[in-house]
């Protein structure tokens, strides 16, 4: 009698362990697939942003060091007015294939060009708009957390 109870317990434990490993394997496979999809979308976004720089005539360069900045846009200022006609964007080499820093700097370009706004908030707003114009709905869902984090669109907790 005890042997049957013990055997039943062992079988139940083995089934639970096998189920756990199957679920873990399947989740890892899904996560890996999602990472591949996200990487593909980020590469496409980066390529689109670089193409936009070329179309707008913005010189884009990569550097090993930029002080404490991940990227920056260089533009002219005269009598309190900002000019981005000959703007240059500089990005750290380690962010060369990552879209968010480039999008932020292009956001500065757009905010200055449209509203004479050189603020970080203005750049983030424009960068978010720009990325959402480039990405389709599914791609936006895939990068939703990244877009919110990089462009400071987080809800304020009270």
Predicted features by range, described:
Residues 117, 121, 125, 129, ...:
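Non-transmembrane interaction and regulatory regions of membrane-associated proteins
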Residues 38-57:
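Zn2+-dependent metallopeptidase catalytic core
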Residues 106-122, 133-135:
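Catalytic Zn2+-binding segment of zinc metalloproteases
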Residues 94, 134-158:
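Long, well-structured alpha-helical subdomains associated
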Residues 1-11:
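Feature marks short, highly hydrophobic, charge-poor N-terminal signal-anchor/signal peptide-like helices
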Residues 15-43:
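Transmembrane-cytosolic junction motif
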Residues 58-96, 106-109:
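Active-site scaffold of zinc-dependent metalloenzymes
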């Amino acid at each position: 009698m005890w042997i049957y109870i013990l055997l039943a317990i062992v079988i139940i434990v083995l089934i639970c362990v096998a189920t756990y490993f199957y679920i873990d394997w399947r989740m890892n496979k899904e996560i890996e697939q999602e990472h591949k999809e996200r990487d593909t979308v980020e590469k496409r976004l980066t390529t689109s942003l670089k193409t936009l720089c070329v179309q707008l005539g913005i010189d884009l360069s990569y550097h090993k060091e930029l002080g404490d900045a991940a990227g920056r846009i260089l533009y002219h200022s005269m009598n309190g007015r900002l000019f981005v006609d000959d703007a240059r964007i500089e990005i750290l080499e380690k962010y060369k294939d990552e879209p968010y820093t480039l999008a932020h700097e292009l956001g500065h370009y757009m905010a200055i060009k449209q509203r004479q706004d050189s603020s970080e908030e203005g750049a983030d707003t424009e960068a978010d708009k720009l990325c959402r114009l480039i990405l389709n709905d599914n791609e936006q869902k895939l990068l939703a957390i990244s877009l919110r984090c990089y462009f400071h669109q987080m809800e304020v907790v009270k």
